[in-house]
Amino acid sequence: MDVILLERVAKLGQMGEVVKVRDGYARNFLLPNGKALRATKANKTRFDTMKIELEARNLERRKDAEAVAEKLNGQSVAMIRQAGESGQLYGSVSTRDIADGLTAAGFTVDRQQVILNHPIKTLGVHVVPVTLHPEVEVTVKVNVARNADEAERQARGEDVRTARDEDAEIEAELAIERAEVAAELAAEEGTEG
């Protein structure tokens, strides 16, 4: 189906372009969301009359998005999740979770604006792009941790997974030393008696 784009659509085209898309994409997404019109002669003339108004509305939305982008760019959102010793999450952090976290921080972000190729399934600080407007994109840091203390340590730059591994190594070394001391004591008692 040929459609006239009423706004810039990522990976499709700019406002005013006539593009060919699959029927389902047009009927289920572009047309209901007001992002496109069917490419008929009547709609082409209608678009030409609406073009100035659409450009003005697009410019206003872009300015609003840029104002929010200044505050949002580089923000950090902490997500507390349960995870195994290796840092693998029991579950995942999705676009909805990130959008809810940003909304709780005082920003108006919809889950469709958060760009994730796949859900986050590991501990750590992840950089996630957020598209506020087709022409305005910012990045936020998603800090996935087991608890608030761990989130603070990760925010400072510590790798919590290696810190836990180091703690486990120290504990193992202490256990070996204790076993050696116990063996020495047992050997001394055996030679005395």
Swiss-Prot record:
GO terms for molecular function: rRNA binding; structural constituent of ribosome. It comes from Xanthobacter autotrophicus (strain ATCC BAA-1158 / Py2). Pfam families: Ribosomal_L9_C, Ribosomal_L9_N. This is Large ribosomal subunit protein bL9. The keyword Protein biosynthesis does not apply. Binds to the 23S rRNA. One of its GO terms (biological process) is translation. Keywords: Ribonucleoprotein, Ribosomal protein, RNA-binding, rRNA-binding. The lineage of its organism: Bacteria, Pseudomonadati, Pseudomonadota, Alphaproteobacteria, Hyphomicrobiales. Belongs to the bacterial ribosomal protein bL9 family. InterPro entries: Ribosomal_bL9, Ribosomal_bL9/RNase_H1_N, Ribosomal_bL9_bac/chp, Ribosomal_bL9_C, Ribosomal_bL9_C_sf, Ribosomal_bL9_N, Ribosomal_bL9_N_sf. The keyword Ribonucleoprotein applies. PANTHER family: 50S RIBOSOMAL PROTEIN L9 (PTHR21368). Transmembrane segments: none annotated. The gene is rplI. GO terms for cellular component: ribonucleoprotein complex; ribosome.
